[in-house]
């Protein structure tokens, strides 16, 4: 206690406090944590684009509200409702009236679909592994998104009012969609390829609006994120199991010069890099819960969840994921407690000594042999090629889906992955597309930081910091992989960003 008191009154602590106070008043702080003029509620409500959009949605909603009002007026006197009242759930047979399942079904709302979206990694694997799933395995997430976007306004209409939350992301999303539409019509040599390529960018950001509007209270929020942490724990345990048994992997996953590396884990995801990115997203969330746990038992639980996830992240041997995790921890330390940066430094120093595989992977990355190999036929060569392709059409690029990603690999002969989502975007959509995407992503981080700064609950503020750290890690990982081409990762990114935006509005 005396050491803590001495630190509180020491010159370094006072200097740190003064620096923190000055930083909170600085222009840089306002840039990241403030609210842009275009994103303030009055600016959004009075802007021409939002007024036009509100008029259009209002015109479409009026008939829906009228129909819902008629249904509400008719229901009290209906024969069906009278029959249900006479033979309601409480008057039903004991087997049914006492059924947890039956009562859960009665309480279902559109918000319940969030459990399915948060379970994306599990549902997607189950459907793809299930015999006879067919096209459902490829389209289930789109069908779920369409269902939510249709059922949500219907539910609001039946409740008597159609409304939605305005967020600082509304105008940046509209701007990006406008730029994407312009580029689509300007550069689409093959419409089917362009549609598939544009879908990678435009479709999944709709999950932002689903999360920002359907998250209603703190209990729902905490339950969903605890479930996500539990999912991450199971995935981590499975990854550790794969490492123990030495799961076989394709030879291309290991460079010929790394003979000591025998396996890389991928769990149910199918790719070590994508598994690493998923864990980068979840680990800071679990860490935030551990640090803000209300009691010792809860802290031990979250630390137990962190252990297999961290081990599995190491065993992916994904250098890009390690870099992303380092950046995510640094962001969380800056947001939650700057003293964690010292712990991060110690961990970065000790990790290569504790796990020799880390030292060999990072050491090989810095070796002349790797740089020569990468420049000849590896990642650096693909990056240079992407820049050459961009130079053919600097402003608008080659067109959506025509270079550097999964869509191009399926449809364009000779196309390879760029292993850099931003260079892929530059090659496909030019300066216009990359600038619009950069503005969108930076606006998303600013929206999240602004929401975090408005929270008064320390536990929620810590959780928001963990989510923001994970999101930042995924953005960093996109610099060396095409992470946003994976529907699961893009869905989780926009879903969690929408969740942070909703946090200041959550009810008790």
Residues covered by each model-derived region:
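Aromatic-anchored transmembrane helix interface
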Residues: 140-143, 148, 168-178, 191-213, ...
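Transmembrane alpha-helices of multi-pass inner-membrane enzymes
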Residues: 118, 147-150, 339-346, 458, ...
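Hydrophobic, aromatic-rich transmembrane alpha-helices
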Residues: 93-104, 118, 144-159, 282-293, ...
